[in-house]
């Protein structure tokens, strides 16, 4: 994928999670909520402050993140793959997969 977001923008590929009902039935389509987790594919150079200083982003390519769905998050199709374009401000957390396993 050849895309470079500007400033504090981040390109994220949504990571689908299997949703199950309380009874163990796998939910698909509209019955399952869209995941708010994804993998960062590309990041901009950083937020430009009023004094012209560039503040680097906290997220990096390969990070698994939890993001806010809705305003500010735009879905695009690039190279046949659906990705999300969002500001770093729309990312609420970086998931440390190693810590979850332990």
Swiss-Prot record:
PROSITE patterns: CHAPERONINS_CPN10. One of its GO terms (biological process) is chaperone cofactor-dependent protein refolding. SMART domains: Cpn10. Signal peptide: none annotated. This is Co-chaperonin GroES. The gene is groES. Keywords: Chaperone, Cytoplasm. It comes from the Bacteria. The lineage of its organism: Bacteria, Pseudomonadati, Pseudomonadota, Gammaproteobacteria, Vibrionales.
């Amino acid at each position: 994928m050849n895309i470079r977001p500007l400033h504090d923008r981040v390109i994220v590929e949504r990571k689908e999670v299997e949703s199950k009902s309380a009874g163990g039935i796998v939910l698909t389509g509209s019955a399952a909520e869209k995941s708010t987790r994804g993998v960062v594919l590309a990041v901009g150079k950083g937020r430009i402050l009023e004094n012209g200083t560039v503040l680097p982003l906290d997220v990096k390519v390969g990070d698994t993140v939890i993001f806010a769905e809705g305003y500010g998050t735009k879905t695009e199709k690039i190279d046949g793959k659906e990705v999300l374009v969002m500001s770093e401000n729309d990312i609420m957390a970086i998931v440390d997969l190693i810590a979850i396993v332990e």
